[in-house]
Each structure stands twice: as structure tokens, then as C-alpha cells.
């Protein structure tokens, strides 16, 4: 799979909706260390139906993010936008990723920053908890370790 481009270059999210007062971007990158060991690269694998799990995780995250605690959006505050969000864009790469490459990209546009921040964080958490994507991490000593298996 090709590296994810700068989110601003994607036609799906290049323009911020006129109703948005906030855009939050989460760019989950491959880092060069984990648990005190040097990391050389990662290989992500996914269940054949991972996309269905991803869509459910995003729906669950939006529902949780907009309905609970600080940043919750009341029907009155949402106005014409019943969901309280203007746009959501999510991509998770599969395959070999090098240090510094983007593994997970989440972009949330909303009328207000609290909802955008909260939903973005909830999307990342729900993806990690629900989506069958597995990470094989390769270390500088030649060893590797499978992790993140929901």
C-alpha cells in the first residue's frame, strides 16, 4: 500500500466545511523505539473484513464522543447538524511501514473544538480496541514481536 499523503491533499478533506470551527488531525506515525528497543519497521496485517469493523468502531466512537462528558453535544448546540460533526476521515494502512510513515490518519471537522478533540481521541481508542489489525514490530537486534491484536 502506498504511503498516506498529507491530509490536506486528499480531495475528501481538502476543504474545511464552512460550518466548521475546528479541525483535529491525528497522524499516528511509526516511531523508532518501543519498550527500550530500537524499531526498524512494522508490518500491519488485517482480517479480510477489517473494514466492517473499522466502520463500526468509528460509528461507536462518534456516538460515545458526542454523548458523554466534556465536549458532549446537545441537540440544541448541534442545530442543523444533528450529529454535531461536519466531516470525519479515517484511514489505516496495511503492509510494511518504515520509521516516520503514517499508520493511522484521523481527521474530524466540527463546529466546536471540544467535540472535534473528543471524537478524534475516541476514534483512535475504538480502532485499537475493535479492529482486527495486527502489528508485527521488527527490532534493531533482528527480533520481532506481534502486538495490538484485539
Residue ranges and their predicted role:
Residues 1-102, 107-121, 125-150:
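N-terminal, polar/charged subdomain of small-to-medium soluble alpha/beta proteins
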Amino acid at each position: 500500500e502506498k504511503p498516506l499523503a498529507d491530509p490536506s491533499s486528499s480531495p475528501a478533506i481538502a476543504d474545511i466545511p464552512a460550518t466548521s470551527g475546528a479541525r483535529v488531525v491525528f497522524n499516528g506515525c511509526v516511531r523508532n523505539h518501543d519498550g527500550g528497543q530500537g524499531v526498524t519497521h512494522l508490518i500491519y496485517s488485517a482480517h479480510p473484513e477489517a473494514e466492517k469493523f473499522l466502520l463500526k468502531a468509528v460509528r461507536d466512537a462518534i456516538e460515545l464522543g458526542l454523548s458523554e462528558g466534556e465536549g458532549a453535544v446537545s441537540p440544541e448546540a448541534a442545530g442543523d447538524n444533528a450529529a454535531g460533526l461536519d466531516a470525519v476521515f479515517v484511514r489505516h494502512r496495511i503492509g510494511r511501514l518504515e520509521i516516520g510513515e503514517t499508520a493511522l490518519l484521523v481527521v474530524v471537522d466540527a463546529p466546536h473544538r471540544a467535540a472535534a478533540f473528543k471524537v478524534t481521541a475516541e476514534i483512535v481508542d475504538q480502532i485499537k480496541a475493535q479492529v482486527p489489525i495486527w502489528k508485527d514490530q521488527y527490532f534493531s537486534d533482528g527480533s520481532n514481536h506481534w502486538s495490538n491484536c484485539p
